[in-house]
Amino acid sequence: MSAQPVVRKDHMKTRIAIIGGGASGVLAALHLARRTDPAGLLVIEPRKGLARGVAYSTTEPAHLLNVRAGNMGALADAPEDFVAWLSQRGDGAADGTSFMPRMLWGEYLAARFATSNVPVLHQCVTRLEKRGNSAILHMDDGSRVEAGRTVLAMGHALPVDIPCCDDVVRNSGRYVRAVWDTWPRWPEADAPVVLVGSGLTAIDILLRLRAGGYGGVITMISRHGLLPCAHGPVESVPAPVIPMDTLPTTRQYLHHVRLALKDGVSWRAAVDSLRPCSNALWARLSDKERWRFRRHLFHRWHTARHRMAPPVARRIVEEMASGHLIVRRGHVAAVSGDRHGLRVHVRASEGEYHLMADMVMNCTAPDTNFGRVDNPLLHELFALGMAVHGDLGSTFATDVNGALFGHDGQVSPWLHAIGPLRAGSLFETTAIPEIRQQAQALSTFLFPT
């Protein structure tokens, strides 16, 4: 494995700066490095470990990929590269159908990046100063980087904090907002734990708790009380179940899905058929129709689209059958407590209820409202007119190549985003297959020949 070039200068210049060294940033760097001199690129990341980000920095073997290994290659034109890497190591999954541990994929991406010769600067960007059609990036140590173009690849923000969570709760160590960071404490062996959320993050935290020896009852609370569905055998249909010429309304989209199910198409195949065209279908909807989908259908779509690996799904079935996992509907309105534990106040359609917990962990979705995210760089981009919020107030508004729209309605010639930061304009933008396609499109746009 080659050593990654690490730069340390008070002031330097680069052709393209990539802010963020997680999966999104590294995928961008790998694709760009195939079309231009890697020495003209610079990945800026404060953490020493690159490529893994939040999802792939886990060290828990039970945390599995939610995509089959055969579609997890880092390069858009080589989706089976991960399988080839596994085979070279003797780790199996050569047929590409397995759901491998996420930490292995993080290791794979780091290995591919290590041979790219893309320089790395281990700093944190705190401010971005526009300089014509380029930018000066200011680091937290006072150094600066002059970049011809800048790619924002900071990944996910923390989830929205639980309301009415007072200082007693915050300082107790019993409430964890950043569940992927080091926890201030572990729950008592048999004391109850409440996970706010019942999606894939909550599943991961349950597995982490069990791996650490916790044997108590875990209660997941979410608005709809739905768990992710499980992956099944690979199925396919010859065309998307929603034709591109369908009248762009939520009702018509749903009508075509129901027709396909009535004709014998499995729900998994129907959902998977839409993955290549979901962003195009989403772009055709009006703001009103997008809001209608978010309100009435998104929770159903999300559980069907973002599925559990089969071994994980079997584990969850066992947890529920034994009574060690309980899933309830409701909205956590407040958390209070004292040195003995926490009291969780939940509002549900059938009424209010309370739960006592030794610990409460926030497993809800990352916050996409950058107006309230604790990130000075993001706030400055909006304040200076370099960025505007995207669909329904989330993340950034970007064009088809990831370029940010400014307050003047114009597309930036030098500022781009990739990955979860594009949720303001794209429906699918968080999974590796979609992010690597964005990386390829960006590299082709910036370097057409």
Predicted regions and their residues:
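Flavin (primarily FAD) cofactor-binding/catalytic cores of flavoenzymes
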Residues: 5-48, 54, 92-247, 255-449
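Short helix-loop boundary/capping segments at the starts of domains
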Residues: 34, 49, 70, 74-77, ...
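N-terminal glycine-rich dinucleotide-binding loop that anchors FAD/FMN and/or NAD(P) in oxidoreductases
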Residues: 57-81, 236-251
